[in-house]
């Protein structure tokens, strides 16, 4: 398959669509009641993971076209806003398999969601540029960050989201 065909392929277009839906939702998460927000996350995160696992490999010819767009300030604003909305549902415990640590460590769901957002928003904005080099970098970065960043974060967030949605109501 030609590089241009890969850059316009179904897996790339589907990833763009799901990533855009995720980023739109995270930007507006405060407009949703928590049960509705958790329900949406339970559906979109597996879709992101599936699309990421099917993502093509692209050889980057011109890495000078590579850019990151989401600033640290934007990241922090989004994380704090999401944490405030999640309230006492923001923190949970998990094990850190990357460091072979079987002891529970605290994790912030808002931080995981902001990390995922940052990688995906950067992918969307870089891919939107006109040049083939920018699109190559966007696709290569999305695959790389799936393997090292946002893909791992999805797998950390999903068990907690499942727990929150399946736990009996405290009022019962």
Residue ranges and their predicted role:
Residues 10-13, 73-76, 80, 111, ...:
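Generic alpha-helical secondary structure signal
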Residues 12-70:
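N-terminal interaction modules that seed assembly of large macromolecular complexes
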Residues 1-3, 101-107, 115, 119-172:
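Acidic, proline/glycine-rich low-complexity IDRs
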Residues 1-4, 25-33, 96-106:
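Short, charged, low-complexity loops and linkers
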Residues 4, 25, 38-40, 55, ...:
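Phenylalanine-focused residue identity feature
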Residues 1-14:
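N-terminal leader/propeptide segments of preproteins
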Residues 14-21, 40-47, 77, 81-84, ...:
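Charged, amphipathic alpha-helical oligomerization/scaffolding segments
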């Amino acid at each position: 398959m030609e590089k241009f065909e890969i850059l316009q392929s179904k897996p790339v277009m589907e990833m763009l669509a799901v990533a855009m839906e995720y980023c739109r939702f995270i930007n507006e998460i405060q407009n949703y009641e928590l049960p509705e927000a958790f329900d949406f996350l339970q559906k979109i995160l597996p879709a992101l993971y599936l699309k990421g696992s099917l993502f093509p490999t692209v050889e980057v010819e011109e890495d000078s076209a590579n850019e990151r767009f989401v600033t640290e300030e934007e990241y922090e604003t989004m994380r704090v806003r999401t944490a405030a909305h999640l309230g006492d549902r923001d923190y949970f415990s998990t094990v850190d398999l990357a460091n072979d640590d079987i002891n529970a460590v605290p994790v912030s769901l808002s931080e995981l969601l902001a990390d995922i957002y940052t990688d995906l928003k950067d992918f969307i904005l870089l891919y939107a540029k006109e040049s083939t080099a920018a699109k190559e970098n966007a696709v290569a970065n999305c695959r790389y960050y799936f393997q090292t960043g946002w893909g791992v974060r999805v797998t950390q967030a999903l068990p907690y989201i499942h727990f929150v949605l399946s736990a009996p109501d405290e009022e019962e």
